[in-house]
Amino acid sequence: MNRKNFVKFAGFGTAVAAIGGMAGCINRTATNLAPASVKGARVKKAVYVPKGRNRFKEELMIWGVIPLQIKVSGKDTNGAFFAFEHANMSKGGPPRHLHYEQDEMFYAMEGEFAFEVGDEKFVLRPGDTLFAPRMVPHVWAYVGDKPGTLLIAIQPAGSFEEFIIKSCALKEPPTPQEAEKSFAAYGMKVVGPPLAVS
């Protein structure tokens, strides 16, 4: 084999080895990113929830004041994921808290929301997304002048959906002591008051 052909062959061999190595890395990475236990969704078909509707069709209001619509139930995902929408929100929000075992994602659909995650402050406007990792204290409040809408996703679902349903059974906001007890019963800890909103 002459030098020119050897260089071409060596270059081709190096490229093949690199691609093979990358494929192996990609395969290992995908495997590492897969959930530890994937049992599949509980439902075996698509779940469609129209705008303005709740997954299970009933009207829900947290503490009798915050409209809520379940979009994806933990029952749909075998507990892997839960998503809900706060629509037509007025000013205010929950107390500062943390989740022991769940990450939370917020997506602003309408209006303006103030957030604090750890020591960082954010303002979410339509189209903005914010991720709050488990074990990091966070608080948020709707601060807009017109009604707002916020989509929230919880991963894994855990008992958060049950917390939401129990909160919807209450007709008025809980006292700070009642909120602490309720949050604690569902894997969360209240660590401060709600954000002040003018």
Model-identified regions with their sequence ranges:
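Acidic/histidine-enriched, glycine/proline-rich intrinsically disordered or flexible terminal extensions
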Residues: S167-S198
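N-terminal export signals
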Residues: N2-R28
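Short acidic-glycine-tyrosine-enriched beta hairpin
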Residues: E120-R134
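Ligand-binding loop in jelly-roll beta-barrel domains
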Residues: R134-F160
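Histidine-centered catalytic micro-motifs
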Residues: P95-E101, V139
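Short, conserved beta-strand element in jelly-roll/cupin
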Residues: A87, Y100-F115
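C-terminal segment of N-terminal export signals and the immediately downstream linker at the start
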Residues: M22-W63, A169
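A short glycine-rich, His/Asp/Glu-containing loop-to-beta-strand
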Residues: L60-R96
